[in-house]
Structure formats: C-alpha cells, structure tokens
C-alpha cells in the first residue's frame, strides 16, 4: 500500500522582499508621474505600469510544497500562486542523509543549496543527495509531523537509527503525529 503526505509551506516575507515590493511601487509612482507630465495622451501606459508592478510584486510570494510518496521526496516551488516549478525530485534510495540542522552543517561543502523553508534559520531538517545535473545537493526544510514520518519510514533502518541518534545529540525532538500540522 502506498503511503503519502504533503505539506504547503508559505514563505514569510522578510525585509528584503518588503524593500523589493516598496521599490517596485515607488518606481511605478515615479514612472506614472513622468508619463502624465510628458505623455498625457498615452495614459494606457499607467494601466500597464500598474499591472506590471502587481505582477512583479506577486513574484515575491513564494510557497513550497513537500510531497512524500513511499519515501520519495518531491518539492515544488510555487511563485505567486500561479507558477509551479519542481525543484527537488529524489527517490528515497538516493537520499544520503536526512538529519536535523546543527551547527556542524557546512553548506559550502555542497554544489547546490536549496532553502525550501521560511529561511535558513528556521529550517529544522536537511536532506542531502547526489544529482547528475547539480552535483552534491543540500535541501534545508521544515517538515511537519506527517511529512517527517513518511520521509523517516522511507529510509533504511540504518539511516533511521542515525537520524534518531543525531536528534538526541542535537536535543531535537522527533516530530510525532500529535505535533501541530504546519
């Protein structure tokens, strides 16, 4: 019987995203004034400017969807609730490590680092694997209890024991079904 879990994680807007959005709308205001001053008959440009600003603003709203089917991990990046891009697709047997994030983790040792969490600081677990396309890959994530359980169950027993040991050493509680779904 197949086992499946999924989680939608909305990325919080940080200071960087807020500045980008503010600059976009400030640019629209300045360009609108210039259009009104120098090209009054071409006011359709104002509508196009506003639409373009809205479209650019929406690109700052990012969500990650974790899907785990029989231990295989897929992560999609959803931009502005309209564009979906698969950023990770790895079979359970190809996962090298599934461990809690600790100070010992060195992202610079990887060719590709993907932060599929609110931020690097809020990521609770990571997955590593080798990709033919991208090389050694590190994925930082925040799985809820169901996604964690499916990833955990998809790993061989030796990797499950390593995860349990790493969680004990790091003082990280293993997520359980009683945990809040997030």
Q: Model segments located where?
A:
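N-terminal membrane-targeting/pre-transmembrane regions
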Residues: 1-28
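Cytosolic, membrane-proximal regulatory domains of ion/volume homeostasis and mechanosensation machinery
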Residues: 101-123
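Membrane-cytosol interface motif
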Residues: 69-87
């Amino acid at each position: 019987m197949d086992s499946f879990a999924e989680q939608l994680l909305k990325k919080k807007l940080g200071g960087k995203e807020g500045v980008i959005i503010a600059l976009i709308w400030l640019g629209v205001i300045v360009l609108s004034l210039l259009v009104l001053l120098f090209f009054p008959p071409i006011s359709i440009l104002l509508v196009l400017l506003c639409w373009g600003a809205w479209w650019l603003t929406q690109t700052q709203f990012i969500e990650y969807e974790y899907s785990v089917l029989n231990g295989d991990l897929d992560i999609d990046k959803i931009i502005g609730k309209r564009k979906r891009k698969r950023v990770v697709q790895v079979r359970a047997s190809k996962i090298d490590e599934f461990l809690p994030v600790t100070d010992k983790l060195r992202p610079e040792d990887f060719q590709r680092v993907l932060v599929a969490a609110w931020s690097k600081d809020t990521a609770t677990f990571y997955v590593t694997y080798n990709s033919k396309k991208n090389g050694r890959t590190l994925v930082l994530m925040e799985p809820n209890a169901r996604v964690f359980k499916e990833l955990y169950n998809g790993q061989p027993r030796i990797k499950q024991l390593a995860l349990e040991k790493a969680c004990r050493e790091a003082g990280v509680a293993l997520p359980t079904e009683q945990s809040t779904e997030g």
